[in-house]
Amino acid sequence: MAMSSFLINSNYVDPKFPPCEEYSQSDYLPSDHSPGYYAGGQRRESSFQPEAGFGRRSACTVQRYAACRDPGPPPPQPPPPPPPPPPGLSPRAPAQPPSGALLPEPGQRCEAISSSPPPPPCAQNPLHPSPSHSACKEPVVYPWMRKVHVSTVNPNYAGGEPKRSRTAYTRQQVLELEKEFHYNRYLTRRRRVEIAHALCLSERQIKIWFQNRRMKWKKDHKLPNTKIRSGGTAGSAGGPPGRPNGGPPAL
């Protein structure tokens, strides 16, 4: 209403439009409209409703964009809820200190942990107590359980081991023992001690080596063994009285 009154009271000049043929030739407007279509332009301006026109246009554009737009990836699904606790157990809430208590500082907490005494190395089982504390003591090693390395025997070795393995002599030790056996097949105690210190062996090892070497020397030279005595030699030398040379008795 205000628009119509403004147009009537004001000195409005009606614009001069060119004929419709020029618009149709210049492709501004289609030629199927009559000249009377443009004559009522003033009346259309008063009855124009922009809200309705914009509403229809927005609906068309929304439908067109919705049809042309590519479907995007589906939204991520929310994570599944955590499983409920078993019926026998109830979730434990963190213990909260009382309001009046003071929390210890980190330094004091570390000192308290470090000052605690360590647990004993061998704790006794209350179900099976052992009065002798055999688990805490070191295992007892008896002489027969030790392994004797005879190749590196201490020269001050005094014996006492009930069981020994075979001695592996080196080439230098065997050469020195062969030289000594070539000159003396029997050794004195003093000479045996000297050879044992020189070859880093024990007196027992020197003694056993010379005994074995003498047995081998007698076997090579086919000499009788002096340690084995035959019991028939004494009986053949002389018979009982009255039987000379073991013959029948004289009548």
From Swiss-Prot:
The modification Phosphoserine is found at residue 90. InterPro entries: Antp_homeobox_Deformed_sf, HD, HD_metazoa, Homeobox_antennapedia, Homeobox_Antennapedia_CS, Homeobox_CS, Homeodomain-like_sf. Residues 71-97, 241-251 have a biased composition (Pro residues). GO terms for biological process: anterior/posterior pattern specification; bone marrow development; definitive hemopoiesis; embryonic skeletal system morphogenesis; hematopoietic stem cell differentiation; hematopoietic stem cell proliferation; morphogenesis of an epithelial sheet; negative regulation of transcription by RNA polymerase II. SUPFAM superfamilies: Formin homology 2 domain (FH2 domain) (SSF101447), Homeodomain-like (SSF46689). A motif (Antp-type hexapeptide) lies at residues 141-146. GO terms for cellular component: centrosome; nucleoplasm. Residues 162-221 bind DNA. The keyword Phosphoprotein applies. It is found in: Nucleus. Residues 1-134, 219-251 are annotated as: Disordered. The keyword Mitochondrion does not apply. GO terms for molecular function: DNA-binding transcription factor activity, RNA polymerase II-specific; RNA polymerase II cis-regulatory region sequence-specific DNA binding. Residues 1-12 have a biased composition (Polar residues). Keywords: Developmental protein, DNA-binding, Homeobox, Nucleus, Phosphoprotein, Transcription, Transcription regulation. PANTHER family: HOMEOBOX PROTEIN HOX-B4, HOMEOTIC PROTEIN DEFORMED. Belongs to the Antp homeobox family. Deformed subfamily. Sequence-specific transcription factor which is part of a developmental regulatory system that provides cells with specific positional identities on the anterior-posterior axis. This is Homeobox protein Hox-B4. It comes from Bos taurus.
